[in-house]
Each structure stands twice: as structure tokens, then as C-alpha cells.
């Protein structure tokens, strides 16, 4: 190899070595968290109005009073979830526990509350989120999430009644921190629904 070629080869190797050192930390410093839950007892769902729920327009005065995330208030927007294609295990008409779990698509709930879905529009309304209530039994309405963010929407249902069943819910806007004011703006929250039975 000619000395000029050797120098050029050394420069290319040095350049590639430096380039690799610069690029590697960016690649090596990224983590990927993969989470899955495999169940053979899942169901498909259909949500009324293709899952688009318009909460309308309200004034800031709508949020006055001591309405908590636990307080069901008539006047929210009703929607239904229809359960279908449950891969039923075994034979016979047996009692199952149907779970309809709601979680924030982004994984982020409103600051300071695990029961309020956050407003995803950073320049939108502040100190406002969304709550969802089960209204299947009018004598027993409840926020679908407990204070620690766990799901409460578990319903006893017989195998023969599960496919094609409909479940009623209501959603409304909720003030997050009672000590702070609400500011006007848009509100949007994406919620994922998981349905399975035990």
C-alpha cells in the first residue's frame, strides 16, 4: 500500500471511530419499556358515536361548588359500550366478572388525581380534566377509577348474556384542584378501554 493511501486509510478509520463514538451514546442512552398482558378471555368493544364524545361548551362558573371526582352529577354526556366476540372458555352458562377498564392513552392522569383524565392540550383549559362514571345501575353510580387509579368497573354477568351486552357510562368535565381557578380553553382527553372477563 502506498504511503498516501495508508494516510488516507488512517484518516478514514479515525473519522469513522470519532463518528461512532459520537453516535453511540445517543443510541446507548435510550431505554425502551415494552409492556404486554396476554389473556385468552378478551372481548371486542363498540363505543357509541365511534367513541367521539363532545362535552359541549360550559362557562367557568360550571366548576363552582364542591363537586369531587367521586360526585356523580346528572347532565354529563352519556355513552354506551357494547361487548362482543368474547372468547368464552368452557361450556355452560356460568357467572363471570366482566372488567371494563379505562386508562389514559398517554399514560398521564391529571396532576394530583388518579381519577381525573388530564387535558392533553397544553395551551387549553387549565385545572380541568375529565371523569367517567358507570351509570349501568342508577342506584349505584360510581367513578370508574378509585382514588389510587385502579379500575372499579367490574360487573357480574352470565356467559350467555355477555356477547352483545351494553354498558352505560357518563362523562363530564371536572375541576382538578378545588383551591385553584379554572381558566378557559379547549379540553381533549384520549381514553383507552380494555375489556376482559374472569
Swiss-Prot record:
Coiled coil: none annotated. Keywords: Fimbrium, Signal. GO terms for biological process: cell adhesion; cell adhesion involved in single-species biofilm formation. Transmembrane segments: none annotated. Disruption phenotype: Deletion of the operon under classical laboratory conditions does not result in any major effect on E.coli capacity to form biofilms compared with the wild-type strain. InterPro entries: Adhesion_dom_fimbrial_sf (IPR036937), Adhesion_dom_sf (IPR008966), Bact_Fimbrial_Adh_Pro (IPR050263). The keyword Amino-acid biosynthesis does not apply. This is Uncharacterized fimbrial-like protein YadK. It is found in: Fimbrium. It comes from Escherichia coli (strain K12). Residues 1-28 form the signal peptide.
